[in-house]
A protein has these predicted regions:
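Structural and coupling elements of P-loop NTPases
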Residues: 1-525
């Protein structure tokens, strides 16, 4: 294949949802239908067989995704890159960064609950980029709300038009299949077990045999609903690809009903890799010159090797192993000799990759979130990835002072990942650090990782801070600043000084009583 043909067949998308809507289960079933796994993890439960996309030990224990997973597989002539994101709101920053690497999104909605708070937040991030958003209304094997009501809620709550591509036949125990509006036929499902592919029988709406399958009453109700749908808006693929119209599909990820038709239709409708914006203008994905940006850093994916991977989204051209590339932020040339594609924690060395692909490269400590990698001689930078301002803070120290070395290593590595903000206290060495997070569950993950990955038990105590400001200009030594109660000077791992405040009043006090002090808000950080 030519480079262009390889890029054209790439499909890179994220899966978003509110917690417990079935996002990870749907991801599993995509892998099942794509042939990437022979049996879905859902069937035996978390204890016997953890979900393929949940690789961190704490994820398997708690049954939630707390870090983004990357999975690549082939299906139907497409090369698919799935970005499975944390659904829990406490990990929204990792999700936000992952969405920056996606070309489209699958939004999973619980059919019994409809649009939920985290769904709204994640949808807004996707909408800002105008990427295609596909809706999968899940859990049709349980009692759900009225399908038409659910579509109307998506339109009302999220401000996007919808088009039901298929329509459910019943719900709960009565869920028997879907009507495919494009093929104008019923896809009747037969249960093959949750871990295996569902059987599908295609039958026309006016086929007398349909009554034997679903009964006369349901057949008549379906005919009325199909007629009602026909009076609605027409399908517009261009509107879909510009994020203005969301195709809606119904199914059950748990029973596999409706998953395969959704996957096949989604791959046909969604876009190949989209162009990216840099400080030198839009970068053409079909350019022969390689470029990429770092959207995630993860330490200790393999505890035996104590390694750290930088995840890169390729934005243009073709990546080739052992070729010399340029790291724009450091101004250094480098050879990436062991690039890897991922299936959660499992890896495979690759010799080449194309625009749209996600690769992981070993990071000796030079990469940061948002960094740009190009061909030598090219110095443009892709638009940066902002971080969320921490809302909760704790003072952290090792219980065993003899483990200070392990404590420092763990703190430094986790800080470089960027999902949890860690600050030093000036002139105090590493006796204590201040940890800032968006959601309090991240404290649990930090504590767990420090113990599990670095062997350090922590002493943690809450702090009253609510805001952070970066010191841009200071008229004196920071130690001589007049601080009010509940404020403290901190230092990040780039050596920049910040001030933590207990409230907005404290910010005003500081600038009023320290003439010449100029502070920047968190977005500047």
């Amino acid at each position: 294949m030519t480079n262009r043909e390889e890029i054209e067949r790439r499909r890179t998308f994220a899966i978003i949802s509110h917690p417990d809507a079935g996002k990870t289960t749907l991801t599993e079933k995509f892998l099942l239908y794509g042939g990437a796994i022979a049996q879905a993890g859902e069937v035996k439960g978390k204890r016997e067989r953890a979900a393929k996309s949940d690789w961190m030990e704490i994820e398997k224990q708690r049954g939630i995704s707390v870090t983004s997973s990357v999975m690549q597989f082939q299906h139907g002539g497409y090369c698919i890159n799935i970005l499975d994101t944390p659904g829990h709101q406490d990990f929204s920053e990792d999700t936000y960064r992952t969405l920056m690497a996606a070309d489209s999104a699958v939004m999973v909605i619980d059919g019994a609950k409809g649009v939920e708070p985290q769904t709204r937040k994640l949808f807004k991030v996707c909408a800002l980029r105008n990427i295609p958003i596909f809706t999968f209304i899940n859990k049709m094997d349980r009692e759900t709300r009225d399908p038409l009501e659910l579509c109307e809620e998506v339109e009302r709550e999220l401000g996007i038009d919808t088009y039901p591509v298929n329509w459910p036949i019943g719900c709960g125990k009565e869920f028997a299949g879907v009507y495919d509006r494009d093929k104008r036929c019923i896809l009747h499902f037969t249960d093959a077990g949750h871990a295996k592919k569902a059987g599908i029988t295609e039958i026309e709406l006016d086929d007398p045999a349909l009554v034997d399958l679903i009964g006369q009453a349901r057949r008549d109700t379906l005919a009325d609903e199909v007629e009602l749908l026909g009076a609605g808006r027409d399908f517009d693929l261009d509107a879909v690809r510009h994020g203005k119209l969301s195709p809606v599909f119904f199914g059950s990820a748990l029973t596999n009903f409706g998953v395969e038709p959704f996957l096949n239709a989604f791959l046909e409708m969604t876009t190949p890799p989209l162009p990216r914006v840099s400080d030198a203008g839009e970068v053409d994905v079909y350019s022969p010159e390689f470029s990429a940006f770092v959207f995630k850093i993860q330490a200790n994916m393999n505890k035996a090797h104590r390694d750290r991977l930088a995840f890169m989204r390729i934005c243009s051209g073709k990546f080739e192993r052992d070729t010399e590339y340029f790291h724009v932020q450091s101004g250094r040339k480098m050879r990436l000799s062991q690039p890897q594609t991922m299936m959660a924690a499992e890896r495979e060395i690759v010799d080449e990759a194309y625009a749209g692909d996600i690769i992981g490269v070993f990071d000796p400590g030079i990469f940061s979130i948002g960094d740009t990698i190009t061909m030598p001689g090219k110095k443009f930078r892709f638009s940066g990835i902002p971080t969320f301002e921490p809302e909760h803070f704790m003072l952290v120290s090792p219980k065993d002072t003899m483990k200070r070395k392990q404590f420092v290593k763990g703190v430094e590595q986790i800080a470089q990942e960027g999902a949890i903000q860690i600050f030093k206290i000036p002139d105090s060495g590493f006796e204590d650090v201040v940890v800032g997070v968006v959601g309090t569950l991240q404290f649990d993950v930090f504590e767990y990782r420090m113990k599990n990955e670095y062997g350090v038990d922590l002493r943690m105590s809450g702090l009253p801070y609510e805001h952070l400001r970066l010191i841009r200009e200071c008229p004196c030594d920071v130690k001589d600043l007049m601080l009010c109660s509940g404020s403290r000077v901190l230092e990040d791992f780039k050596g920049r000084k910040l001030i933590a405040f207990g409230g907005e009043w404290s910010v005003g006090f500081l600038t009023k009583h320290n003439e010449g002090l100029i502070l920047d808000d968190w977005l500047s950080v």
